[in-house]
Amino acid sequence: MSKGSSKHTVRINQTWYIVSFILGLSLFAGVLLSTIYYVLSPIQEQAATFDRNKQMLLAAHILDFKGRFQIQEKKEWVPATFDKKTQLLEVATKKVSEVSYPELELYAERFVRPLLTDAQGKVFSFEEKNLNPIEFFEKYQESPPCQQSPLPFYVILENTSRTENMSGADVAKDLSTVQALIFPISGFGLWGPIHGYLGVKNDGDTVLGTAWYQQGETPGLGANITNPEWQEQFYGKKIFLQDSSGTTNFATTDLGLEVVKGSVRTTLGDSPKALSAIDGISGATLTCNGVTEAYVQSLACYRQLLINFSNLTHEKKTGE
């Protein structure tokens, strides 16, 4: 072996060379990962927003469990498409595919409005309170339910040309244009926080659906709260508990939805309480208890708003 080769070998084995190599490799890896994060971050945020909006519209029954638009026609839910010309949902005349990101964004822009309410059920727009909806909802999610004022919620406007361009302030002044309400639901499952939505008809009592966009429950057990087969039983349930005679005192009755252990029919039969109960998930009792508590705690502060919508619906029916 030549002297030059020996010197080169010694150089490679020197500590400073090894340290320099490791530092250089670490720097390269750090720059590479930072670049990848910078490039992918907007895409990830867009995907998260798309999923959250889908879950919201699923809870409001605007989307079916296959992610397709649907519309109520003669008291039946039928497939629908978002007509680019009329900017409205129309009964589908051919096979409907899953909603795309642009379609969902366009529908949300036209017919979904974030609003605020207080303990008296008065409704405000975010513009009136000079608040940013995105920042406010993020902050609200991090707080215990009902610990923040004012309270946020969403509304789905009626599928008409009259409502598509209404601002939040316009809607707050004319709640008769509201088709459905969507409430943020937060609580704790077995393994951590759970966050989702509950959709309610404009009668302030009848459930349209539920969806969870964040949960870390056990796959095959507690995670089944995101299973369509479990979620579909929420449709038509009542969030205000009826008494034994079948009447509802909205001001004093219990408010929420109870996930029972076992089946509703076996546990409650045909009693009025069954209208506000959901079948439990086998092997996921603690998750189900957390879900029940999430509905009770999250909805409690919206009681007066729900009562106001119930009264509004009654007035509309009386005036017809």
Curated annotation (Swiss-Prot):
Where does this one sit in the cell?
Answer: Cell inner membrane
A single BP term in Gene Ontology: sodium ion transport
A Pfam family annotated for this UniProt entry = FMN_bind
Q: What membrane topology term does the record carry?
A: Single-pass membrane protein
Q: Which UniProt keywords apply?
A: Cell inner membrane, Cell membrane, Flavoprotein, FMN, Ion transport, Membrane, NAD, Phosphoprotein, Sodium, Sodium transport, Translocase, Transmembrane, Transmembrane helix, Transport, Ubiquinone
Q: Which InterPro entries does the entry link to?
A: FMN-bd, NqrC
UniProt record similarity statement = Belongs to the NqrC family.
- The name on file for this protein is Na(+)-translocating NADH-quinone reductase subunit C
